[in-house]
Amino acid sequence: MSHFAFEQIGVIRSPYKEKFAVPRQPGLVKHGGGELHLLTPYNQPDAVRGLEAFSHLWVLFVFHQTMEGGWRPTVRPPRLGGNTRMGVFATRSTFRPNPIGMSLVELKGIRCHKDQVILQLGSLDLVDGTPVVDIKPYLPFAEALPDAQASYAQHAPAATVAVTFTAELASSLALLEKRYPHFAAFVQEVLSQDPRPAYRKEEEPGKTYAVWLHDVNVRWRVVDGGFEVFALEPR
């Protein structure tokens, strides 16, 4: 059996500071963009020459927060309610023999300054600090296949949960919107995807949850089948 060693070429900077509530695919949270910072010695403008002519990129990365758990031959995809087992190679689970993921993201711009090369990205599904091992331009003629079949994931999941904020958060939201434009919409988009594990989605009303988005601890509770955000606690 052959073994290969790869070097990290970059790192992701995103508003998702923990695994919980990271979208399961890119494009689901419109306001959840981020950046890819190239590392030395790959942070050279020549390395991205011509990349600005492409609208989207494949980002290949490492599942660095789950790799210690090893791989599993079968997993339970969230899209199937967390109860049905599928072979790991029939899913995009993080528990793979090689902890490599791939994400298709929009390239919104490239910023080069001194020793920095930063790719500005659209909607992400990656946690802050994710190691990147390669990037490749997306080629629509070869990779957009309208007749492709995708079993249980043929269509994007619909936002399933209504998200509201308590009236007491109005002033806090106004301040956060100045620091993070569209912050309220971002929080609603993230939570509307219902990040709870499938086995917890039948929990009693009033159950509370929290997640770090940007540098804000967002706390919410289950109310009448929806989510009510009741606290926004900056770090």
Where are these regions (language model features)?
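Arg/Lys-rich, positively charged N-terminal/basic patches that mediate binding to nucleic acids
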Residues: 1-45, 51-53, 140-190
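Short coil-to-beta-strand transition motifs
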Residues: 2-8, 95-105, 214
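Short, conserved beta-turn/loop elements at beta-strand boundaries and strand-helix junctions
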Residues: 17, 110-116, 225
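Active-site-adjacent substructure of cysteine-protease-like catalytic cores
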Residues: 49-101, 193, 201-205
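Basic, Lys/Arg-enriched alpha-helical interface segments
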Residues: 52-55, 158-235
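Short, solvent-exposed secondary-structure boundary/capping segments
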Residues: 114-124, 228-231
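Flexible glycine-rich active-site/ligand-binding loops centered on an Asp-His dyad
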Residues: 119-153
